[in-house]
């Protein structure tokens, strides 16, 4: 990052609701311009989730489009549509009259890229060379890059790098999201170095969390990645701080332990005894959410829903639906019982986002439970025994009309079916000001697709009914809701609950004691490392006795603690520069200074804005700054003024003034006065 830009723009803050390039974003643009565009190197943007990697990438793509072609790879088509729409919003932050070539910016998805290059081939070496060579001199930007590490997609990217002159910009808030194996992909995607796994990684066992980078590996990272990483993780003072609630704190977070009923515990133990190596098996995730009887009911769920049968007393399948008193008593699900008890005793609590990962079984049981308890599905018929947003089950709002609670479920199935417009429509309704308190849609149940790119507004509670695969995925979900523009009041109380289905005395005394010791803030790094090693041994020894949810959360947090070694290396490899600004970045900097000055001032002298722009610059740019200011005024750069709103700048005699942009409508034409 460029230190001059970073420190200068921090001095002249403007409200975050106005269009602008934030200080760290413009400072990162300089980094990308120097390393990727000028030096033709691959780089990693390790920026905290919610810090604006999207806008940085789009601005850089627009600037780079003058010189080269850019390919942006997104997780799915729905997210790709969002990026494409934001491309034109980003253009308004620059000078619209510059000779950008937006035709040089291409978008694709991970699956499309795989299909295009691999087709039906399973062997990466069989890819036709011409298919790779077309990416010569491309800058390839990869969103959520950590999802490419350690799989076939990552191998494909490495193959492209080895057989073309393409360079990468990797975007991630969590480079090592699952295992230390990610380091191999990071090194090979950023450099021409081959990462010899057995040489640089040592293992204390066959569990993923038992692997660690050795001293040789640390030296390799320092030697090869210095200057190729941009790190940003500044605490935001303009957003609410999430409040984690729970009845016990593990290594990182408080969690809610939800003891299973005897019915659910017996069902859990039966399935667990029939399942080998059940740590990351989807089956146990489903069993931890809801008791459905025999193992075949989980593995052949479609057949179960097509039948008419009793699963437990007071719990049946009939005509493709779950029915019975158990949907209300909820002995079948300790997590749903805790969740329902909370929402049915909390009037006017606002909007909730509820994360769950088991889309088929999860969607079906959640829908059945919500409807049985009086909460209607959005855009469907209102249930007879509805629960009111304001008075809950009383349905007596002081002679006012009651508002039925409603929910909606969004999973990757909608995206896979191509229903991106449906997802965008639902989220648009959910985020509207009229739904600020949840009167239109109160509950949004979402899977991982929400965590990847969508933004949620005015969320008051975030629930996790299934344990995310990694700590970074958990943080992504939270970051999608807690953003600078998502709340009118930064002091809004936002509660986060991670729910774990547990059995009695789930945590052994030894593991509990280590966790308590680890929380001691006075511990040295060496003492923490020793405790982590001890914790690792206990996890291995007691793993089989721990309930699935608790085990998975402990593994996730433990892996996160182990990954801090590599993270700290990455952080230290990120450097601040004081370089002279390249013309592309100097233009962006000048426009941003004009934008900030024009927020407070609607009329000013040329000499005043020049003085304001130059005051912290350490290099002499001769006449460039004045020439660019004149150019931008003549071109009518768009700004935002606190009195007049959206404006453009223009000359009035010898002064620079802001002129309001006014939309004018008649029966034939929507135009604007510019």
From Swiss-Prot:
SUPFAM superfamilies in the cross-refs: P-loop containing nucleoside triphosphate hydrolases
GO molecular function, one term: helicase activity
Location(s), subcellular: Virion
Positions bound to ATP: 45-52
Complexes and interactors: Heterodimer of a 70 kDa and a 82 kDa subunit. Part of the early transcription complex composed of ETF, RAP94, and the DNA-directed RNA polymerase.
Function recorded in the entry: Acts with RNA polymerase to initiate transcription from early gene promoters. Is recruited by the RPO-associated protein of 94 kDa (RAP94) to form the early transcription complex, which also contains the core RNA polymerase. ETF heterodimer binds to early gene promoters.
Stated name of the protein: Early transcription factor 70 kDa subunit
Protein's organism: Melanoplus sanguinipes entomopoxvirus
Underlying gene: VETFS
